[in-house]
């Protein structure tokens, strides 16, 4: 039986690499996959390249807040059988889209693998993550580490000087270099510290 999977982590845990590897595993066995990634400023049915930090890449359909995953996958599936749907940056999904993905699993019997962040720089859940935590059949945490060596499960947003940013929009387009993954302990300490992240890391060594 197909299932809906949610692979979540802090930043730089290899989510995109894991997605591309999973897609490759299907394709290596002659099975067809459909990949999606977020682009909130594009129209449906356009394509975008998914690229991992280690250089792996693949073409993917883009989704925005208007994308109907179920209708799209039904149309594609009728022309050529789909064996797996994989969604990158799934934290940008909304409630209806998560339900769409569950229908792909339950009605079409196609597994859906979603990869994304669980929480933002304030440790608040993203919309997509909230609904996937409620609707997914399987929850899998992908692990990365804090500068102290503990498991990182939070992200901090920083400015050019390494100072912690505590307020602002939840989504910062193209701002991956503005985030640092840390453990819960150092997430709280950083929010309470006047030091820049760089000075704080040096002090803790």
From Swiss-Prot:
ATP binds at residues 9-16, 88-91. Its main location: cytoplasm. GO terms for molecular function: ATP binding; thymidine kinase activity; zinc ion binding. Keywords: ATP-binding, Cytoplasm, DNA synthesis, Kinase, Metal-binding, Nucleotide-binding, Transferase, Zinc. It catalyses: thymidine + ATP = dTMP + ADP + H(+). GO terms for cellular component: cytosol. Coiled coil: none annotated. InterPro entries: P-loop_NTPase, Thymidine_kinase. It comes from the Bacteria. The keyword rRNA processing does not apply. It holds the Pfam family TK. The active site is at residue 89. It is found in: Cytoplasm. The keyword Transit peptide does not apply. It is an enzyme of class 2 (transferase). Belongs to the thymidine kinase family. Homotetramer. This is Thymidine kinase. It comes from Blochmanniella pennsylvanica (strain BPEN).
